[in-house]
């Protein structure tokens, strides 16, 4: 949390790596018995870190890269490009909503939000005209819509925040940042240190501990904001509707996931 810049009351950050989580620094912990968030004592005196996670984020998009978008992966490697960049460029040509396609990323079972351990991944709305570009965009949107369900919990706790920090490998994707901004309806801030935030947090603890730095706000000088992604108002409406459909469909899929798991045990 410290290395990501969440060192003051109400600061929120979103980490996207293999898994993903959203966390807030606050004087009062997030006490939700139905969700059971992770609560940690902050290294900042008088603060807690409340964390809600999903278990399949970047690894779901990696699956898209390796299984669905293998041709783009090989093309990118031949050109000396990051495959994720080429896939994102392809997906960016598809309009928001991926032409009626939804992706559910829980490919490793349930998480803090989806408690059913049998929860699985799914594409819903798949049509004959959809291409790999549609599937790639739907994946980025689906992971982001799952995280929006997490963010809704934090908006109850910190109702007036307008921006959040994004760290981890997911912060590198231009399209993903824009999708997140539009779904969250928040400005996405990417600090200059996104991959080594744990090491930066350790350095901050040491620096403050020995009196080298006055407090943990030193992180703002060390890890400055390198990019801001603003909300595109024209795309907010469709994502608000998709968020409703996503949440409704996730609930409807809960029982079939359990039945499929039971059937699989019989094979």
Regions picked out by a protein language model, each given a short descriptive name:
Residues 24-267:
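Glycine/Thr-rich phosphate-binding loops that ligate phosphate moieties of nucleotide
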Residues 13-14, 23:
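Conserved active-site beta-strand element of glycosyltransferases/polysaccharide synthases
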Residues 1-11:
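Conserved phosphate-binding catalytic cores of ATP/NTP-utilizing and phosphoryl-transfer enzymes
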Residues 1-3, 20-24, 103:
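Short beta-strand scaffold segments in enzyme catalytic cores
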């Amino acid at each position: 949390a410290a290395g990501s810049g969440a060192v003051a009351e109400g600061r929120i950050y979103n980490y996207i790596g293999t898994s993903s989580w959203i966390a807030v620094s606050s004087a009062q912990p997030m006490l939700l018995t139905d969700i059971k968030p992770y609560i940690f004592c902050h290294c900042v005196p008088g603060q807690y870190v409340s964390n809600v996670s999903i278990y399949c984020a970047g690894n779901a998009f990696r699956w898209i890269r390796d299984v669905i978008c293998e041709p783009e992966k090989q093309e990118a490697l031949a050109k000396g490009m990051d495959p994720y960049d080429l896939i994102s460029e392809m997906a960016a040509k598809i309009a928001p909503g991926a032409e009626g396609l939804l992706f559910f990323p829980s490919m490793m079972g349930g998480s803090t939000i989806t408690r059913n351990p049998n929860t699985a991944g799914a594409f819903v709305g798949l049509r004959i005209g959809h291409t790999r570009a549609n599937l790639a965009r739907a994946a980025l949107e689906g992971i982001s819509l799952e995280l929006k369900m997490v963010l809704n919990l934090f908006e109850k706790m910190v109702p007036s925040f307008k921006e959040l920090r994004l760290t981890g490998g997911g912060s590198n994707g231009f399209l993903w940042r824009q999708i997140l901004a539009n779904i969250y309806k928040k400005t996405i801030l990417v600090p200059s240190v996104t991959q080594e935030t744990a090491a930066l947090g350790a350095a901050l603890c040491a620096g403050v501990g020995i009196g080298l730095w006055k407090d943990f706000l030193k992180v703002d000088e060390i890890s400055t904001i390198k990019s801001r992604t603003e909300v595109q108002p024209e795309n907010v409406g469709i994502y608000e509707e998709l968020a409703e459909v996503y949440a409704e469909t996730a609930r409807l899929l809960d029982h079939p996931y359990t039945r499929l798991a039971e059937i699989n045990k019989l094979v």
